[in-house]
Amino acid sequence: MSKNHVCMSSCLKIPSACLIFFCFYTIIILHKRYTYVFKRKIIIIFGLTLVSLLSHAQYDVSFSHYFDMEPSFNAASVGKQPKLNVSAAYAIDLAGFKHNPQTMYAGADMPFIFLKTTHGAGLQFMNDKIGLFTHQRLALQYAVKMKLFGGQLSTGVSAGMLSESFDGSKLDLEDSSDPAFTSSKVDGNALDLAVGLYYTHRNWYAGISAQHINSPLVRLGETNELKVDATYYLTGGCNIKLRSPFLTIKPSFLVRTDGVAYRGDITTRLVYTHEKKMMYVGAGYSPTNSVTVLVGGNVHGIVMGYSYEMYTSAINPGNGSHELFIGYQMDLNLQKKGRNLHKSVRIL
């Protein structure tokens, strides 16, 4: 998992003695994660290096297991199967570095029938911490589904709250009396909206979505503000059965952009299934960014996956990213009212 951008206004002043350390640390972190634009004056800490970083950063987090976490970027994918779906992921970026990015995600979704129409509902929470910044999102998701061309088309919306905070009290600066610099902890909230379309047809699927369509503006204290740009996603994948009835190849892709920066991921997994057992190995590639290896399987009905991402970009800190994924699914019988809706546990 690697991460990317934020647009923020602020004003800081860094003593020259700390400049070299902060510049080196910031270049490494921000190349993978965040870029900040400031309202009153540009922070000396970032210097001219931010000019190039501005074109390579995005706000949203990238997960290696995106194929099993589609509700995290497309609300229309909630309830895509007649199952209760629960997933969680924890990722450590730039392992070994102090204040390195750490992200936790948890979500659940399920379908339901209302007025003879299939709908989907979901809930998700994300906590993303990098350095002195903490980004949180709590959102509700809804989707309505209809049959189309032999498949199923789903239209979804999401409404949630972004919570942003910056703990300036932990910075060690000589000139903390500068009124333009935030030396205390500040936080703020803003409404966050998203929309999406998702289509499934037998052994393939495709989806398109837009996150942060209202471009949330979070005010942090009296002088700082953080603006999140809308981000657009395109995803797809399929199942390719091999001669062996136990083996399936599952290629998938995810492309996203905010109109300035972009990231693409291509992943292929070889999946072995037999009765209730499942194991997989896979590899992913993000052009100009990283190469990822994945491995996983199910244990007592719970799917566990691990991935390691190795950076291939010009600015390479030497340590990669670790990601752990956990998923659980339970079959639902949507046709029987007033009865126990679950039948059995299935693997992802």
Model region roles, listed by residue range:
Residues 1-60, 331-348:
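Cleavable N-terminal export/targeting peptides
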Residues 58-348:
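Subset of outer-membrane beta-barrel
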